[in-house]
């Protein structure tokens, strides 16, 4: 499915670059975006490819249809339950990796968003590339309401705006 989305480079180019990074001693943080018209098999293939790359962290993004972009009118099949299943599949296929719920989680998970925190290790807050995300205070309240604790202080976290979660 990758060639129908990315036209500037091939999937093999991406894999080669990630392997070079891993061989240089870098930990791989590589995930994907769902909701672009991919099949269930495409999602499984993505997670299988990430297994081969030994990704340490997998950010899972959910497409936010932005007006004026090629994906604005895409007919996605992302329901809150489907998004949870995708996150659960990531967890099952990558039990030792850090699974990160990234862009679009608020938009697609809606009222089921807190359930995702039982699957993932971290969430992105305060904005994404094209859209604003859930604010820090609202995310912290959700985390606290569930009885989780922040594993990394937000003010000391790296600039990519994620907070790691640790169960109480």
Regions found by a protein language model. Give the residues of each.
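Active-site C-terminal subdomain of aminotransferase-like
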Residues: 30
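Conserved non-cysteine loop/helix-boundary elements of the Radical SAM core domain that shape
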Residues: 1-25, 33-54, 70-82
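Auxiliary Fe-S-binding modules of radical SAM enzymes
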Residues: 48-168
């Amino acid at each position: 499915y990758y060639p129908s989305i990315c036209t500037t480079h091939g999937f093999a180019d991406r894999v080669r670059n990630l392997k070079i990074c891993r061989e240089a001693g870098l930990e791989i943080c590589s995930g994907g975006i769902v909701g672009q018209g991919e099949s269930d098999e495409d999602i499984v293939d993505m997670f299988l490819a990430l297994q081969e790359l030994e990704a340490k962290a997998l950010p899972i993004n959910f497409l936010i249809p932005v007006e004026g972009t090629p994906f604005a009118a895409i007919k996605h099949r992302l329901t809150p339950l489907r998004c949870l299943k995708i996150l659960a599949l990531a967890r099952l296929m990558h039990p030792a990796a850090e699974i990160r719920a990234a862009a679009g989680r608020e938009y697609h998970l809606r009222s089921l968003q807190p359930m995702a925190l039982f699957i993932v290790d971290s969430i992105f807050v305060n904005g994404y590339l094209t859209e604003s995300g859930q604010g820090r205070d609202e995310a912290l309240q959700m985390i606290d309401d569930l009885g989780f604790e922040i594993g990394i202080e937000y003010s000391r976290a790296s600039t990519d705006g994620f907070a790691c979660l640790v169960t109480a």
